[in-house]
């Protein structure tokens, strides 16, 4: 009986995360070394990154003319600056082994920040175990060397900064992440709500302007040459994705997948879900409904709210999950953003620990199925839906976010 109680306490008591997390990270570091040693590297985009950087170093500043063997440069300027550094560190991209080591360090840094967020949000230790067991996540970082690793790191650092009320630093890091890959724009709705709740409208708009200014500063070398070309390539919102590479909507069939009606339906669903979350989940700390909140905000009668760390983390990760659920096409590297978010969102959905692990295993299987199938893509959608609608439904049933806040004060 004592053993059962001890094991339960070890798994459920947030106080244990302070020592469980370092042990898991240490074990994962060993696993990373084994993966680099034993599992062959797979070339996908690394060579293209290096070819594009070579053109940049040679003086090319027209984004439309920077290309590689697998296509044109389609990422914002911060991506160029980061991989310019990697280009020089890895002997123009030829030292793949060193590149893998650098990405392993990046992976462990991302994992460390994510676990810190979990601990500060009062999450139980059993949620940390899935964070170190994702085959696809290890692959994205160490075997594929995708730029998503840097964007995911920026995402988690910004979440941690926002959780600790470091608003300006959080906005800077988040905008830097957007400058690596546009995926981080999916967090923008939640960030806007969190900032307005915490700072009111004026200061929030100033931080929004700062985030935009950072993008302009990153892009200056390219904006001076061909501004339209830079914006259209780096921030292209109408890009068409090939059906054969999709991870999420394969089960709907190629004809529907490529149709404009399907694209518009997903956009409408995205807007609807964001509206529901704003009205029912994200505005809860304000103590008022959406019309009253907007009225007080416009009339400058709104009193700022003190947001719990768990609330901020839940808002930002649920905004991410909503965007991924409604995305027309997800590729395997998008798992860099989702992998560490899923256990926390399932917990905030109020799911039993066993169900948390069941959904996590199903999602992991789906994202490791290559090429994707009708079944695996359906599971991708269902697992994302479980996270989104789980958090939404739990906000109606009980004050789970408030309970999480209370746990923080007990730590």
Curated annotation (Swiss-Prot):
It catalyses: an alpha-D-Man-(1->2)-alpha-D-Man-(1->2)-alpha-D-Man-(1->3)-[alpha-D-Man-(1->6)]-beta-D-Man-(1->4)-beta-D-GlcNAc-(1->4)-alpha-D-GlcNAc-diphospho-di-trans,poly-cis-dolichol + a di-trans,poly-cis-dolichyl beta-D-mannosyl phosphate = an alpha-D-Man-(1->2)-alpha-D-Man-(1->2)-alpha-D-Man-(1->3)-[alpha-D-Man-(1->3)-alpha-D-Man-(1->6)]-beta-D-Man-(1->4)-beta-D-GlcNAc-(1->4)-alpha-D-GlcNAc-diphospho-di-trans,poly-cis-dolichol + a di-trans,poly-cis-dolichyl phosphate + H(+). It is a multi-pass membrane protein. One of its GO terms (biological process) is dolichol-linked oligosaccharide biosynthetic process. Its EC number is 2.4.1.258. GO terms for cellular component: endoplasmic reticulum membrane. The keyword Transmembrane applies. One of its GO terms (molecular function) is dol-P-Man:Man(5)GlcNAc(2)-PP-Dol alpha-1,3-mannosyltransferase activity. Residues 40-69, 117-139, 224-261, 328-340, 397-411 are cytoplasmic. The chain crosses the membrane at residues 19-39, 70-90, 96-116, 140-160, 182-202, 203-223, 262-282, 307-327, 341-361, 376-396. It is found in: Endoplasmic reticulum membrane. It holds the Pfam family ALG3. Pathway: Protein modification; protein glycosylation. The keyword Transmembrane helix applies. Keywords: Endoplasmic reticulum, Glycosyltransferase, Membrane, Transferase, Transmembrane, Transmembrane helix. Residues 1-18, 91-95, 161-181, 283-306, 362-375 are lumenal. InterPro entries: Glycosyltransferase_ALG3. Belongs to the glycosyltransferase ALG3 family. Dol-P-Man:Man(5)GlcNAc(2)-PP-Dol alpha-1,3-mannosyltransferase that operates in the biosynthetic pathway of dolichol-linked oligosaccharides, the glycan precursors employed in protein asparagine (N)-glycosylation. The assembly of dolichol-linked oligosaccharides begins on the cytosolic side of the endoplasmic reticulum membrane and finishes in its lumen. The sequential addition of sugars to dolichol pyrophosphate produces dolichol-linked oligosaccharides containing fourteen sugars, including two GlcNAcs, nine mannoses and three glucoses. This is Dol-P-Man:Man(5)GlcNAc(2)-PP-Dol alpha-1,3-mannosyltransferase. The gene is alg3.
């Amino acid at each position: 009986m004592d053993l059962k109680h001890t094991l339960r306490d070890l798994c459920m008591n947030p106080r244990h995360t302070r020592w469980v997390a370092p042990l898991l990270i240490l074990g994962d570091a060993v696993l990373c070394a084994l993966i680099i040693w034993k599992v062959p590297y797979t070339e996908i985009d690394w060579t293209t990154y290096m070819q594009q950087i070579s053109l940049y170093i040679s003086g090319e500043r027209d984004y439309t003319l920077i290309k590689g063997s697998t296509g044109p440069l389609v990422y914002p300027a911060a991506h160029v600056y980061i991989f310019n550094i990697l280009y020089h560190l890895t002997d123009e991209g030829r030292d793949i082994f060193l590149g893998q080591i650098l990405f392993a360090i990046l992976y462990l840094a991302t994992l460390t920040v994510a676990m810190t967020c979990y601990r500060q949000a009062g999450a139980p230790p059993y949620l940390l175990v899935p964070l170190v067991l994702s085959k696809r996540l290890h692959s994205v970082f160490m075997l594929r060397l995708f730029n998503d690793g840097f964007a995911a790191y920026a995402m988690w650092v910004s979440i941690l900064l926002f959780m600790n009320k470091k608003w300006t630093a959080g906005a800077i890091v988040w905008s830097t992440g957007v400058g690596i890959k546009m995926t981080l724009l999916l967090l923008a709705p939640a960030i806007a709500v969190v900032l307005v709740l915490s700072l009111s409208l004026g200061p929030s708009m100033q931080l929004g302007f700062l985030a935009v200014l950072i993008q302009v500063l990153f892009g200056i070398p390219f904006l001076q040459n061909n501004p339209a070309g830079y914006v259209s390539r780096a921030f292209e919102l109408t890009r068409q994705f090939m059906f054969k590479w999709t991870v999420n909507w394969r089960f709907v069939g190629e004809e529907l997948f490529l149709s404009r009606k399907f694209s518009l339906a997903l956009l409408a669903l995205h807007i609807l879900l964001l509206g529901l979350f704003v009205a029912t989940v994200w505005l809860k700390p304000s103590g008022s409904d959406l019309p009253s909140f907007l009225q007080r905000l416009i009339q400058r009668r709104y009193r700022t709210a003190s947001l719990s760390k768990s609330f901020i983390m839940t808002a930002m990760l649920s905004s991410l999950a909503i965007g991924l659920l409604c995305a027309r096409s997800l590729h395997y590297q998008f798992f860099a953003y989702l992998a560490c978010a899923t256990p926390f969102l399932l917990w905030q959905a109020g799911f039993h620990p066993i169900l948390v692990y069941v959904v996590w295993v199903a999602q992991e299987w789906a994202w490791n199925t290559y090429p994707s199938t009708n079944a695996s893509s359906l599971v991708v959608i269902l697992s994302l839906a479980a996270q989104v609608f789980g958090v939404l439904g739990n906000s109606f049933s009980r004050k789970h976010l408030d309970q999480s806040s209370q746990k923080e004060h007990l730590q």
